[in-house]
């Protein structure tokens, strides 16, 4: 049976009639003098709800929010969050350091509130990280089911341990059942998933963890097979790849962004090896995200966390917190993610196999209970 409805925090907007905010000046700007070079004292953005006072006297939220960016005012008076490398000579960039609104920029850090009855419920902004904290799989399952019903954009960020730990089949299930709208991963995830599909091993080992003869080269043979086909998509079409995560993404038309690193073998065709281009491709998805699940990958989780706002704007519900779930066997990663500024993240300290298996069963029960 389905549990009680998930408690959702209510967003309370700032009182712009208060003396300080009503009398605040329009956010000052300075002109960019050279491409990619920000003015001194540029305002550095956070991932929290932010408002900018325009020259028309109105407070508005900038578009495409993220942390570690700047605020650029376009010719129509609309404010956008942009990475510093993207500014161009002549752009108007907001300057100032104050976040309390007195200089025309307000970071509304405490806008989300729970009703008293739900004060002790599972939620994101105040979640602490501990391996001793029980995992409320039902609440996470409810989130996923709600997002699918609303046709949200759920991003999954995956590390290779997900493939090695037998959680692969469960991720395939989530993809095939409409719970994944984008997959962000590195070359290794795709390589070992495809190795499993073609050779039947990951890192040369069977699903029981037993080494195979010549297994050290299995991943290279998988890469070579995809290179022969020309692309991952072509390898699915010609049935070189007949199952697994990448196969499911291609068949279900789920976009995937594979980013390279200095340690990669191959890489596979389609892997983005330019770090800035990879960031841009990932950012195209984080701008659309309504939920994010990160599993067993430190660098990718932190990179995506840096791009995610803590909220998004829903046409029906207004400003909504962006649920971000970070799963890892180590408390270090999930704590590090929060320390780096992804305050909305809920840390789940467990291994990928257990998490994916239990979550799938719980989601299936949630779907059955809603019928």
Predicted regions and their residues:
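Loop/turn positions that initiate beta-strands
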Residues: 88-96
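Active-site pocket-lining segments that scaffold enzyme catalytic pockets across diverse folds
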Residues: 144, 148-156, 160-178
């Amino acid at each position: 049976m389905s549990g009680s409805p998930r408690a959702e925090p209510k967003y309370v907007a700032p009182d712009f009639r208060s003396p300080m905010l009503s009398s605040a000046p329009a956010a000052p700007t300075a002109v960019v003098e050279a491409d990619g070079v920000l003015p001194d004292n540029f305002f550095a953005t956070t991932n929290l709800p932010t408002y900018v006072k325009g020259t028309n006297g109105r407070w508005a939220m900038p578009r495409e929010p993220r942390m570690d960016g700047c605020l650029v005012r376009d010719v129509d008076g609309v404010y956008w969050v942009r990475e510093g490398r993207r500014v161009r000579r002549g752009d108007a960039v907001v300057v100032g350091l104050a976040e309390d609104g007195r200089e025309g920029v307000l970071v509304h850090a405490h806008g989300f509130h729970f009703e008293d009855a739900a004060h002790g419920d599972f939620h994101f902004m105040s979640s602490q990280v501990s391996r001793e904290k029980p995992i409320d799989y039902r609440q996470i399952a409810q989130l996923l089911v709600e997002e699918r019903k609303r046709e949200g954009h759920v991003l999954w960020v995956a590390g290779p341990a997900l493939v090695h730990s037998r959680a692969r089949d469960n991720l395939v299930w989530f993809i095939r059942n409409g719970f994944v709208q984008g997959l962000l991963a590195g070359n290794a995830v795709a390589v070992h998933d495809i190795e499993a599909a073609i050779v039947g091993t990951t890192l040369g080992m069977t699903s029981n963890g037993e080494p195979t003869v010549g297994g050290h080269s299995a991943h290279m043979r998988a890469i070579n097979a995809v290179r022969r086909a020309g692309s991952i998509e072509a390898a699915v079409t010609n049935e070189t790849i007949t199952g697994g995560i990448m196969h499911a993404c291609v068949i279900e038309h789920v976009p995937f962004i594979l980013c390279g690193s200095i340690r990669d073998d191959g890489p596979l065709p389609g892997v983005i090896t330019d770090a800035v281009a990879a960031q841009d491709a990932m950012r195209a998805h984080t701008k659309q995200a309504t939920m994010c699940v990160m599993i067993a990958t430190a660098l990718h989780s932190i990179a995506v966390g840096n791009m995610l706002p803590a909220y998004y704007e829903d046409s029906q519900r207004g400003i909504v917190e962006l649920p971000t779930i970070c799963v890892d066997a180590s408390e270090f990663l999930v704590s590090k993610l929060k320390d780096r500024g992804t305050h909305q993240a809920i840390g789940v300290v467990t291994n990928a196999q257990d998490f994916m298996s239990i979550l799938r069963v719980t989601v299936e029960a949630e779907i059955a209970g809603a019928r």
